[in-house]
From Swiss-Prot:
Residues 167-355 are annotated as: Imidazoleglycerol-phosphate dehydratase. The gene is hisB. The keyword Hydrolase applies. The keyword Membrane does not apply. Its cofactor is Mg(2+); Zn(2+). It comes from Salmonella typhimurium (strain LT2 / SGSC1412 / ATCC 700720). In the N-terminal section; belongs to the histidinol-phosphatase family. In the C-terminal section; belongs to the imidazoleglycerol-phosphate dehydratase family. Zn(2+) binds at residues 93, 95, 101, 103. CDD domains: HAD_HisB-N (cd07503), IGPD (cd07914). It comes from the Bacteria. Pathway: Amino-acid biosynthesis; L-histidine biosynthesis; L-histidine from 5-phospho-alpha-D-ribose 1-diphosphate: step 6/9; Amino-acid biosynthesis; L-histidine biosynthesis; L-histidine from 5-phospho-alpha-D-ribose 1-diphosphate: step 8/9. This is Histidine biosynthesis bifunctional protein HisB. Residues 1-166 are annotated as: Histidinol-phosphatase. It is found in: Cytoplasm. The active site is at residues 9, 11.
Amino acid sequence: MSQKYLFIDRDGTLISEPPSDFQVDRFDKLAFEPEVIPVLLKLQKAGFKLVMITNQDGLGTQSFPQADFDGPHNLMMQIFTSQGVCFDEVLICPHLPADDCDCRKPKVKLVERYLAEQAMDSANSYVIGDRATDIQLADNMGITGLRYHRETLNWTMIGEQLTKRDRYAHVVRNTKETQIDVSVWLDREGNSKINTGVGFFDHMLDQIATHGGFRMEITVKGDLYIDDHHTVEDTGLALGEALKLALGDKRGICRFGFVLPMDECLARCALDISGRPHLEYKAEFTYQRVGDLSTEMIEHFFRSLSYTMGVTLHLKTKGKNDHHRVESLFKAFGRTLRQAIRVEGDTLPSSKGVL
């Protein structure tokens, strides 16, 4: 998975910018913006890597000697490092606007390597700065810009905005047999809308969302004039992919889940969001169909889902009523998924450092 980055301006964003000459060229001019250090620590824990990018007009010239810049800058970096704030890179353009160089913000020369394919997670990377040129840089990079201001968008607000969970994914899967559109919101509940053309299957998918504590919208157009095979199978593939994408870097998730009794049935579900697809399934049914859903397709659905989601899934149910047996499997999976996707911290739940 590609990396999340924050490209952060220096003067006026990390540290205060002197209004007299816009140069931090003496130690007494060095002052940190409020809450910048604790918020950057919080953002690092949330998985962001930090890159400083700054225009320093005329750096190295008589109007702004390098030595005058180096003292306060090095002290600033030492303070950041001593508090645990680590910048992967510090990118500096020393030119004046009149020089018409390639590296001055909002041009992208300094950040070209991050624009290579899959070098960064563009959907979750940001430019943070106090000037319009910082927002223009974000536009040129194809990422979101956040314009820092002590009153309207300060570091506390930025930290809250960037660490607030709203895990979402949208998957479209089109084949000759099916056209499927799936959206999932892992941190929202209710208002799920599901239409696969197979009524009982819709009801079962809704059980996953309801007991999983999340919202999803699924629309399927399948070759039901033949049977429900492709509709159920491809829905499982698309839903599994959407859940995997919505989980993102999996940082802070519980990872494991277990459960569930239902009426005369006892369903057991064990789930590990491991990155290793595997299904163990045991369920017997008296009839070939429950409503308009083929009972043989239930295992196929969970196998397809576990494959694209990348999870280890054990499912088992016993009971007397086919409807209850089927429903117990979907409810147990939903309830188990609720436990596993819940966020309880900010670390990756793996001794290997990867899921």
